[in-house]
């Protein structure tokens, strides 16, 4: 049997076993689930560093210290946020309205894992699946296979040790497009959680199954005139260099005003930003993008030094981010697109009105995802809430802010983009997205007096019809009326006469 056939068979086997596990865990109590989650968190924390190192060594993307923090976010921080979340039994009850909401698991989930955040995504999706009493089977990116398999094994073994069913968390070990497609369309898969490239997310939504997918990011960061420039630049630099820019919520372009342009540039230079010449920008763009604005995978998650050397440009020691000035958006301005690495576009506008227009243009290439602004003016924040972005972050780095590390958003590595970006949700995905909710509703009104007891049910024309019926002694519209039947009989009679006449003529 060749590899593709074996991978397809493996996908089928994992789905079958996962469904059995899903049926078992569906009966677990909150206490049992919490015990399992605590065991998974403990194991993930103990292995956070080694998993991070494995991911960097295997993919070449990012920095192991930041991937360690991602693993920490996906386990320790996530657990703190969801431990008291109601996902089992009665999750809401309104005594006055006599309604109840009952949570039920979805069953077997499929999780797609990207190469940029492999171990943290696997841990995260496993955690939210278990919290909602679901089983999950992963489809890993081939370039991150080993570290993903190890992350899945660690949390699976910890879960089983704490009482979870065998095969509750599993992963394809022979990844192929055929296996992924087989899993997506398998009858036992209830929901697909898709985190990855646009093609994979689109395929998930085309599989004929419910899916939670994410769109591409292209986050602009607007430094408004009232901003604390030093703090704004510090947050942006910390965000863009976090794991070398692999988080899709990270800043992609900086927007400044004419009045603060010089101060912002000076602060970026002070904090390790290098402003490239137009010639250097052109060299970097040719390196970063292939076939239009498709990013060169070899440049994803690389340091500024690595990018500069590959582009054959000289940069000062200590450079953390490469910055290229742009004067437009679109194919002629490559840095106006998403760059999951340590490179930023830089724009200058006259005022907030122009910043609004430019932000909307930039967001078209990552619509629905995230944007950030740095300002002390609340009115400016409210104006920017009209932009097509599901996460509008204020005075924080967008990588950490969007994923919930530096904000009060729910910690998540699956960030919905709403219908703007072709997603079924605009939220950070949590266990609450992975449950079916039954609604129990008691009758609170008598069915036979609904109209008569409703003072707003007042239609004069209806009253007139009822009066006419009463006066005439019969309803205006009766089921016993033969008007339609009489018409039909007359029509058939005419047709028959016409046929006879035609025969006579022959």
Put a short name on every predicted segment.
Residues 1-100, 128, 270:
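N-terminal Rossmann-like NAD(P)+-binding subdomain of aldehyde/semialdehyde dehydrogenases
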Residues 19-22, 26-29, 40-48, 52-55, ...:
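Structural signal for hydrophobic packing residues in well-ordered secondary-structure cores
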Residues 133, 192, 257, 307, ...:
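Residue-level signal for inorganic ion chemistry
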Residues 26, 313-506:
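Conserved C-terminal structural/oligomerization subdomain of aldehyde/semialdehyde dehydrogenase
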Residues 90-231:
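Rossmann-like NAD(P) dinucleotide-binding subdomain of oxidoreductase/dehydrogenase enzymes
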Residues 5-8, 201-330:
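ALDH superfamily catalytic-core signature
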Residues 27-31, 163-169, 244-248, 274-285, ...:
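Flexible, glycine/charged-enriched surface loops at secondary-structure junctions
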Residues 14-16, 213-215, 244-248, 333-340, ...:
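Short, flexible turn/loop "capping" segments at secondary-structure junctions
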């Amino acid at each position: 049997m060749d590899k593709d056939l074996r991978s397809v068979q493996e996908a089928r086997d994992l789905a079958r076993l996962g469904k059995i596990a899903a049926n078992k865990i569906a009966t677990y109590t909150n206490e049992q689930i919490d015990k399992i989650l605590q065991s998974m968190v403990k194991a993930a924390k103990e292995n956070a560093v080694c998993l991070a190192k494995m991911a960097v060594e295997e993919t070449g993307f990012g920095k192991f210290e930041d991937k360690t923090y991602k693993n920490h976010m996906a386990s320790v921080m996530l657990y703190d946020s969801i431990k008291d979340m109601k996902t089992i039994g009665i999750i809401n009850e309104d005594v006055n309205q006599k309604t109840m909401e009952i949570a039920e698991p979805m069953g077997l989930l499929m999780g797609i894992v990207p190469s940029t955040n492999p171990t943290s995504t696997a841990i995260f999706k496993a955690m939210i699946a278990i919290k909602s009493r679901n089983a999950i089977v992963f489809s890993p990116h081939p370039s991150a296979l080993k570290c993903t398999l190890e992350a899945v094994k660690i949390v699976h073994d910890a879960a089983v040790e704490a009482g979870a069913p065998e095969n509750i968390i599993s992963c394809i070990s022979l990844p192929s497009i055929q296996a992924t497609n087989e899993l997506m369309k398998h009858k036992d898969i209830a929901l697909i959680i898709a985190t990855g490239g646009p093609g994979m997310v689109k395929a998930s939504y085309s599989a004929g199954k419910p899916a939670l997918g994410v769109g591409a990011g292209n986050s602009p960061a607007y430094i408004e005139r009232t901003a604390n420039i030093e703090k704004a630049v510090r947050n942006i630099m910390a965000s863009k260099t976090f794991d070398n820019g692999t988080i899709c919520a990270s800043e992609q372009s900086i927007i400044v005003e004419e009045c603060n342009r010089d101060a912002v540039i000076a602060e970026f230079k002070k904090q390790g930003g290098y402003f490239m010449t137009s010639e250097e920008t052109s060299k970097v763009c040719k390196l970063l993008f292939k076939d239009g604005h498709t990013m060169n995978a070899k440049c994803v998650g690389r340091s500024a030094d690595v990018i500069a050397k590959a582009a054959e440009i000289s940069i000062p020691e200590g450079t953390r981010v490469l910055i290229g000035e742009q004067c437009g958006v679109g194919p002629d301005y490559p840095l106006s697109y998403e760059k999951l690495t340590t490179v930023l576009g830089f724009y200058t506008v006259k005022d907030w009105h122009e910043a609004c227009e430019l932000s909307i243009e930039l967001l078209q290439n990552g619509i629905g995802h995230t944007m950030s602004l740095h300002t002390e003016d609340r009115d400016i924040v409210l104006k920017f809430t009209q932009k097509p972005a599901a996460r509008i972050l204020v005075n924080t780095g967008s990588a950490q802010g969007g994923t919930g590390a530096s904000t009060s958003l729910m910690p998540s590595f699956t960030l919905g983009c709403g219908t703007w970006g072709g997603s079924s949700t605009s939220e950070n995905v949590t266990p609450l997205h992975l449950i079916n909710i039954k609604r129990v509703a008691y009758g609170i009104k008598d069915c036979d007096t609904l109209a008569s007891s409703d003072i707003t049910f007042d239609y004069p024309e209806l009253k007139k019809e009822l009066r006419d019926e009463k006066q005439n002694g019969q309803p205006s519209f009766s089921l016993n009326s033969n008007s339609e039947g009489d018409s039909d009989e007359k029509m058939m009679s005419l047709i028959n006469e016409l046929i006879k006449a035609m025969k006579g003529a022959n």
